[in-house]
């Protein structure tokens, strides 16, 4: 009988990426196969997130449900990973005795060893250290699961915003070597991946070592990735305004593989609140970045994060946020009511904004951004959009679903052979969360591919010709 593994994941795309690597790791080295049913599993792993309110309580509620499974099967191994594990450490075991393994985001690569320790009789195996970027050196080769893939390029954050736990749970910023990232993406491209999403808590702070002892900036990395044959779209998540430098903006001007969509969190439009949040920039500086971006890429769509009801936020502060939303014309947002995270500087501030007021402000903000998004979607009516077909439509399996460059889902009638490739569709209808398309042409009528193997890019470097034009040559 095959050994079964069940992973429950909460939180950001980085956690989703980490969970996929856990599955690959335990599958390759220990022969575990994934199951959706916790009752079938020999190992249960909970990959946690500490961003939301009452994150710890949510973890213990889940562990309570899993305890009943362990009572029936004493050989069942239960592990807790992610940011709550990093934050709480041994306290998780003290409260939930059913837990065997506690590991942090930076130590998931040690899971096979931890499992063996438990099998040998150790009562609790805990490792929530920050061993630089070691975890990427011990993970198996990437495995594509469709035409899109996430690739982690760095870990941690060194900005220490007053409300955020990330520096304490994932550590300081550490970048992967650029050659390792390029190799991983080249391997994914050879498996049919067409779009990559570069992941990090603050990707534009990326400064990765090169094979010759130099440093690769984020802008340079974007150009290297764009040169890999088969990679026709590049996204990245998440970035910080204070390091969104001109060289990154320049990439938007000359690199069509970089999509016309950017998630750039601002959190608030009030300079007073931005200062209290320790964001390191003012609203006018954020707008300057957007202005320069739209000069380089006029059709780019912008999304953001917003925290509503941060300590001390007045009606005037909220009005400043709404003014920024109107000025920038945000297309989408992840907006949340503020709740204090234990151990952060903001947790010591009085939470003095009434909850009903917070809820009202959140509803107003979300309504405004929904209106702006619908306005732009209507402008897309009648246009031809190139979409990457990801699979069957969620609502109608007889149809196909894809995503536009500006991150809108499009459902259309098409043949299964188009899954994993690009098609052009005419937008014929607009809904709140999706668009309706009419098939125009398939990829065989486009000129997208180059006669290069993805591995060829590993030997390339940037070189300027006599006219100052940048090229990538062997």
Curated annotation (Swiss-Prot):
It is an enzyme of class 2 (transferase). SMART domains: Elp3. This is tRNA-2-methylthio-N(6)-dimethylallyladenosine synthase. Its cofactor is [4Fe-4S] cluster. It is found in: Cytoplasm. It comes from the Bacteria. Signal peptide: none annotated. Catalyzes the methylthiolation of N6-(dimethylallyl)adenosine (i(6)A), leading to the formation of 2-methylthio-N6-(dimethylallyl)adenosine (ms(2)i(6)A) at position 37 in tRNAs that read codons beginning with uridine. Keywords: 4Fe-4S, Cytoplasm, Iron, Iron-sulfur, Metal-binding, S-adenosyl-L-methionine, Transferase, tRNA processing. [4Fe-4S] cluster 2 binds at residues 157, 161, 164. GO terms for cellular component: cytosol. [4Fe-4S] cluster 1 binds at residues 12, 49, 83. Its EC number is 2.8.4.3. Monomer. InterPro entries: Elp3/MiaA/NifB-like_rSAM, Methylthiotransferase, Methylthiotransferase_CS, Methylthiotransferase_N, Methylthiotransferase_N_sf, MiaB_methiolase, rSAM, rSAM_horseshoe. GO terms for molecular function: 4 iron, 4 sulfur cluster binding; metal ion binding; N6-isopentenyladenosine methylthiotransferase activity. It comes from Shewanella sp. (strain MR-7). Binds 2 [4Fe-4S] clusters. One cluster is coordinated with 3 cysteines and an exchangeable S-adenosyl-L-methionine. NCBIfam families: miaB-methiolase (TIGR01574), MiaB/RimO family radical SAM methylthiotransferase (TIGR00089). Belongs to the methylthiotransferase family. MiaB subfamily. Residues 3-120 form the MTTase N-terminal domain. It catalyses: N(6)-dimethylallyladenosine(37) in tRNA + (sulfur carrier)-SH + AH2 + 2 S-adenosyl-L-methionine = 2-methylsulfanyl-N(6)-dimethylallyladenosine(37) in tRNA + (sulfur carrier)-H + 5'-deoxyadenosine + L-methionine + A + S-adenosyl-L-homocysteine + 2 H(+). Residues 143-375 form the Radical SAM core domain. Pfam families: Radical_SAM (PF04055), TRAM (PF01938), UPF0004 (PF00919). Residues 378-441 form the TRAM domain.
